[in-house]
Amino acid sequence: MAAKSAVNGLTKSLALEYGPSGITVNAVPPGFIDTPMLRKAEENGFLGDIEKTIAATPVRRIGKPEDIAAACAFLVSEEAGYITGQIFGVNGGRNT
C-alpha cells in the first residue's frame, strides 16, 4: 500500500507542477492483465486460483493488454486534455 500511495501522490504532485505548462499527468494502475508473465506466475502457484480472481472481478474476466493501451491512448488524446492528476484504474471494477 505504501508504494501505491507514493505513486498516487507523485501523480498528483507532477500534475500540479506541470499543469501550467499544458502537460497532463495521470497514472494507469492495471488490474490482472492476461500476459505471459501472469500465466507463468499462475503456473508456478504464485497467484492461487485465477478463476476466483475472475469471479471477484465485476466484469468477470481478466484484462487484456489492449484494455490498458486503450486507456493510455485516451489519456494522451486531446479529448482528455482537461484530465490530470488522476488515477485511472483499468481493473474491471476490482479495486484492491
What residue spans do the PLM features occupy?
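Conserved catalytic core of two-component sensor histidine kinases
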Residues: 4, 69
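Alpha-helical segment proximal to the catalytic Tyr-Lys
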Residues: 16-20, 81
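A glycine/serine/threonine-rich, flexible loop-to-helix segment
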Residues: 32-56
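A conserved structural motif in NAD(P)-dependent oxidoreductases
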Residues: 57-68, 79
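Short C-terminal tail/terminal secondary-structure segment
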Residues: 73, 84-96
